[in-house]
A protein has these predicted regions:
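Extracytoplasmic gate region of multi-pass secondary transporters
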Residues: 43-45, 226-284, 366-374
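Extracytoplasmic
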Residues: 24-58, 246-252, 369-373
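Residue-level signature of mid-helix packing/kink "hotspots" within the transmembrane helices
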Residues: 41, 69-77, 160-161, 274-282, ...
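Cytoplasmic helix-loop-helix junction between adjacent transmembrane helices
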Residues: 117-155
Length: 426
């Protein structure tokens, strides 16, 4: 008996060691996700500095920043397939290294370097959340997986808030734009090395090796042949855009230049939206599961976003802009619910690809809306006769996006348990 026990214990110890290694790798990938969101949101607190850095206008800066979403959306499709084909060790650290190199390139005061750097940032960032979910699924028991993914999402949102609320005061105290981007680039590259060292090698299935990389793209045919997938992407994209573009690119400039807030107050107010995400994402997800329905939570949250946007722009009630932006951020957490719906309206064997598919659709829509907002409204920030009316026009643009999200939501299939036949039959 002792001989068999001795033979089995090394295998068990090896399994436990590998599980711990996956948890450690997940931890570093969560840091990756935090830093990725900080990189995404921090340009909003340095628009004027970036204009001087690249010797271009605010519209030119918006164009440079917007190219991030071109590569982020397209690489979202590649990231999931790369994880399945190559494993985490040979894909996620590479994505993080690309993000770090993109930050270093962004520090070069040349528009072309800024464009390429931002493209690299978007491409590398696409591996963060997907990689964290992949590693969490291998490091945590099934009963803790949802908690691990929820914690990952919250940390990412904190990164978005830190990119404004922490970086803003640093810039205000005189930190040079060049120094910031070199510094964060080096930090990201160091964490990428630690991630590579900590991530264990995996035994990939023979079906993956035989099928080749192209076979991993076939599930996307299933996802993109389902009209509900597009509806999920449109709804999530319309709810994400007011935060990713309206707040994380134009928020600080709008409050500072249109409403004449101090730089410090503008940064604090803008940072309330990603801080609201930290609470809104898990809260609204829990509420959706609790009532067993998806659509009412999406529609109700979009309506709250519209009311909060109207309050911020027209202030009919004695509610501060800071609180209004926080409420807006909490409600925008409903943008994550279509990520659950797209998995529920597609077959079980393509759920991973469904996540990549909705990421692609969401940020492709973001990439389309960004230039529209920049040309129609953003370019006039601080440069029009009636600044208050200009701010209100910007708010109405995002309120219209939320209204359109509500309309499209009515065409979504209700996938909550309360709508299932067994839930209503007795």
């Amino acid at each position: 008996m002792s001989a068999s026990q001795a033979a089995s214990s090394p295998t068990q110890a090896q399994t436990q060691a590998q599980t711990r290694a996956f948890v450690i790798a997940w931890f570093f990938t969560v840091i990756f996700y935090f830093l990725e969101y900080a990189v995404r949101s921090s340009p909003s607190v340095m628009i004027s500095g970036l204009e001087d850095h690249f010797s271009t206008s605010a519209l030119g800066i918006a164009t440079i920043l917007g190219v991030y979403y071109y590569t982020y959306s397209s690489m979202s499709l590649v990231a999931g397939a790369a994880l399945d084909h190559l494993g985490a060790k040979r894909s996620v650290p590479v994505g993080m290294a690309i993000l770090g190199l993109g930050c270093l390139l962004f520090s070069v005061p040349v528009v072309l370097a800024g464009d390429i750097g931002r493209l690299c940032q978007g491409a590398g960032s696409a591996f963060a959340f997907t990689g964290a979910v992949y590693l969490a699924a291998r490091g945590f028991p099934a009963r803790y997986l949802a908690t691990a993914i929820g914690a990952t999402q919250c940390v990412g949102m904190l990164g978005g808030s830190a990119g404004q609320n922490v970086v803003g005061p640093m810039i205000e105290r005189g930190l040079a734009i060049h120094t910031f981007w070199v510094g964060i680039g080096i930090i990201i590259l160091v964490v990428a090395v630690l991630l590579y060292i900590s991530t264990p090698k995996e035994q990939l299935g023979t079906h993956i090796q035989e099928g080749g990389f192209s076979s991993l793209l076939k599930p996307y045919e299933v996802v993109f042949s389902n009209p509900q997938s597009y509806l999920c992407g449109i709804v999530a994209g319309l709810l994400f855009a007011p935060t990713t573009i309206g707040d994380m690119i134009w928020g600080v400039a709008a409050f500072q230049k249109d409403l004449q807030f101090s730089y410090h107050n503008a940064v604090v107010i803008a940072s309330m939206v990603p801080l609201g995400w930290v609470f809104g994402c898990p809260l609204l997800g829990w509420l959706s599961d609790r009532i067993g329905r998806r659509k009412p939570v999406i529609i109700g949250s979009a309506a709250v976003m519209m009311l909060a946007g109207a309050q911020i722009a027209f202030h009919p009630l004695p509610i501060s802009a800071r609180l209004g932006m926080f409420i807006f951020g909490v409600a925008s957490g409903a943008a994550m619910i279509p990520y659950s719906i797209i998995k529920e309206v597609n077959p079980d064997n393509v759920k991973g690809s469904a996540t990549g598919g909705i990421n692609f659709l969401v940020f492709a829509l973001t990439a389309l809306l960004g230039p529209v907002y920049a040309h129609r409204i953003g370019r006039g920030t601080g440069n029009v006769p009636n600044l208050a009316v200009h701010f209100q026009r910007g708010a109405m643009f995002w309120i219209a996006c939320c209204a359109l999200a509500i309309v499209v939501s009515f065409f979504l299939r209700e996938t909550g348990r309360a709508a299932q036949p067994q839930a209503v039959s007795k």
